[in-house]
Amino acid sequence: MPHAESYDYIIVGAGSAGCVLANRLSADPRCSVLLLEAGGWDRDPMIHIPLGWGKILTERRHDWMYFCEPEDNVGGRRVECARGKVIGGSSSTNAMAYVRGNRGDYDRWAATGLSEWSYDKVLPYFRKQESWEGGANQYRGGNGPVSTQFCRYKDTLIDAFAQASVQAGYAQTKDYNGERQEGFGRLQMTISKGRRASTASAYLRPVLKRPNLTVLTEASATRIVLEGARATGVTINHRGGERTVLARKEVLLAGGVINTPQLMMLSGIGAQDELAAHGVQTRVNLPAVGKNLQDHVSVILMYRRRAPGGPFLRNMRADRIGFDFVKTYLTGRGFSGDVPGGVVAFLKSGPARPLPDVQLLFTAAPLAAWPYFKPFKAPFADGFATRIVATQPESRGAVKLASADPSAAPLIHQNFLASPKDWESLRAGFRVARDLAAQPSMQPFIEAEFFPGPKCQSDDEIDEHIRKTSITVHHPAGTCRMGADAASVVDPQLRVRGVDRLRVVDASVMPDLVCGNINAAVIMIAEKAADLIASSKEGRAVQ
């Protein structure tokens, strides 16, 4: 890296959004781009083998190791908040589900004054990002960087669960990322030839040889350099040494929902009273920074499976799965090239709901399988699970500084289940999951419900199960809210209010959560941001 450390664009965070920005901005050979990543390269085979996701998640490999603050609504627990700390960010560590959200999510954004973020306006960026196995149509893209496909995991239990949804009278959808989201359908994944299709593999790796793109790993941003009301660079800690890199055009924050507001506050951009409490000088009084935190909270229902069990149990013996991991990693073909999912649903908990507020994720495997492997025999009884997710949460939390030390984790106040409607969504979804298990097609597979168990029946008992066991499904958003109003953190062009040459491009700009997993939406935001940046001269602040 040359001594004159200045670039046209500095991107902070090589995650779901940052890798997209690096690709699109460096496509102009006249622009120099620096991409900073606090983690390392994505060399771990477990990242790339889809079934390795279980170990990535439970062992929290390549993770920031964040935990939420204790909260009464979840029994005083500190719920873990997994965030990817590796090239590709959470797109390298997530469960690979590909869900865009509902048309109504984006039209709701537009109704607040964000007219350029309506469904019709963002659809081209969803199409641009993907290469859908079914080919291009008016909703789907056929030539984008991210390969998307239906989950190909095969198990008769998955077919039985899909049939149960028909027997119970629920609506069906052939493509929840197409014309209609609501209903039961086959899960879609970001997998290509038996490997995870992260933004690192899809967007970044193909362009690493561009001479105008520099990537620094193990480089943590500690402060945004401000000259008056203008962002001119970033101070970084790179492998133990601190230095400053300068941006001639813009600094682009893509560190994610937790790290982006933390960096802004450490740099003096935030609520004046909160910054003063930690001895941070206020440069821009922007009280909304870190506020509006929201996430998808979930609860699970698990069953034991009748003998002889399914393919997951048979293949998870250490001698078999070890061989299969190697085979899949080298050839892209094998049992490990998919995950034991298959069916997903987006449902309304009641007729008054304008959009689906419940997501069901069916898994043809017991959660007790995650701490694999023990030699030569499966260390768990076979089973399956349905995860119930509240997709339209009304509860709002905040990310706050714990100290002025950049190496200290911030305080994450999720404020889970603060709204009665969030409880209603989970409760309703729980009863739907039980209804599905009671259908005729499921009876040959069910030995017994074991979590929480058949004694959990009343609303109070279900609520206690939710309180004791609910977790996040790792879809945080909103902490640098985009809006047309002066109280928002960023304007509709993602420019930070009160600061020139500074934008936020990640899930923190979402005004509110979309219905479903958020990786596709974050990629869309980055694709759209790249066009906004390319069409902008300096990214001047909006007052």
From Swiss-Prot:
The active site is at 475 (proton acceptor). SUPFAM superfamilies: FAD-linked reductases, C-terminal domain, FAD/NAD(P)-binding domain. The N-terminus is blocked. Optimum temperature is 30-35 degrees Celsius. Its cofactor is FAD. Pathway: Cofactor degradation; B6 vitamer degradation. Its EC number is 1.1.99.42. One of its GO terms (cellular component) is plasma membrane. InterPro entries: FAD/NAD-bd_sf, GMC_OxRdtase, GMC_OxRdtase_N, GMC_OxRtase_C. Its main location: membrane. It is found in: Cell inner membrane. It is a peripheral membrane protein. GO terms for biological process: vitamin B6 catabolic process. Involved in the degradation of pyridoxine (vitamin B(6)). Catalyzes the oxidation of 4-pyridoxic acid to 5-formyl-3-hydroxy-2-methylpyridine-4-carboxylate. Monomer. NCBIfam families: PRK02106.1 (NF002550). PANTHER family: CHOLINE DEHYDROGENASE, MITOCHONDRIAL, GLUCOSE-METHANOL-CHOLINE GMC OXIDOREDUCTASE. This is 4-pyridoxate dehydrogenase. It comes from Mesorhizobium japonicum (strain LMG 29417 / CECT 9101 / MAFF 303099).
